[in-house]
């Protein structure tokens, strides 16, 4: 999979990290959205058009699309807070991944607003890095040990 993503990684359109034992594909706001918007840019659509089939090829794997913002408040009619903005962005990305071949029953969306910064929000650069979409490859629960044999301790 990393080989398939290499050109997008090399061009700065996405990064891949391991977070809490999960592979996370990170897409910066600058590639996907205009500031304060959940409408995907043309470049973002192109990146997702390339990424969707790669994710779809991972048979049986599930993905969580997480929307993240910086700590600067937003107060618009459509987005009363960063929670709504981050959720709308995650949903828009998830819906487009479905259009590009990822089965809808393998995608979930989550809004994180400004609760999981990767950089300090004290600088413009840090805030820019915190405005992102993360696509986390969920662990395959069928590969986890069977815990049904354990009885509740009472």
Kindly give the residue locations of the regions a language model identified.
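Short phosphate-binding/catalytic loops that engage adenosine nucleotides
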Residues: 58-60, 102
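Structural motif
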Residues: 22, 62, 130-132
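Periplasmic OmpA-like peptidoglycan-binding domain that tethers envelope proteins to the cell wall
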Residues: 32-45, 50, 68-148, 153-154
